[in-house]
Amino acid sequence: MKKSILMAALGLLSLNTIAQDTPKEEGFIFTTVKENPITSVKNQNRAGTCWCYSGLAFIESELLRMGKGEYDFSEMFIVHNTYLDRADKAVRTHGDVSFSQGGSFYDVIYGMKTFGLVPEEEMRPGVMYGDTLSNHTELTAVSDAVVAAIAKGCLLYTSPSPRD
């Protein structure tokens, strides 16, 4: 019995030695039909502002595709102004409007229409503490708490101007 088990095991192991290499097939080769120009890839780092980075990258690429020139708009300009606007709306509705880092493509369009656009050189990300990239960890923690405290407060009067 032991002999037959040993012979069966050796027989199975020998199958591995006579296996032949299969020829490797080449993968699918893509052919570029149309290549649109794009702007450089930006790093949002630790800021929940992907909505602004992707939205402005789309707009910059579309301007480039249409032959309108190469632009690098400031994401932080749109983010800064929309956060102020969101904070004002959250306070006026006593917290019934979402105040968070997230957003959508329409927030970029709204920011362009309402506040305009500026070049990246005018308002770079990470201008605090010598950083070169955005880090909104502290900003989010503080601004969420401040807006929530004001929104749930018992103030009877709110200034008509959000920037007063």
State each model region's role.
Residues 157-164:
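Conserved small/polar residues in nucleotide/adenosyl-binding loops
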Residues 42-85, 90-120, 126-127, 131-133:
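Active-site-adjacent structural elements in enzyme catalytic domains
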Residues 1-21:
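Bacterial Sec-dependent N-terminal signal peptides
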